[in-house]
Amino acid sequence: MTTREIEFDPDKAKTNFQLHKVDFEDAALVFSDPLRIERRDDSEGNTADEDRWQTLGMVKKVLFVVYTERGERTRIISARTADKTEKRSYYGNDKDNRKGWSKAD
């Protein structure tokens, strides 16, 4: 990923930290992970009028981050510790589950 400005809603960041114990400032570091993988967020709950992406990247531990692109800015929507299946996808140990994930730019 090229250098981009990272942004997020401070209130959403606070709520996210209370729920998942992941700070958005830390989550922003996943975009610097050269091994980061991503996929389009096609989850049922995604009803936004914007393209959302899911990414897995290492920041002390593997994080699962949902974000969107707004011009030259990357806006973090949510972040949490990756679950077992997502970790296997990140490490490349689950070829079947890696479907849809691709190496990030």
Language model regions located:
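Ribonuclease/tRNase effector modules and their secretory precursors
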Residues: 1-105
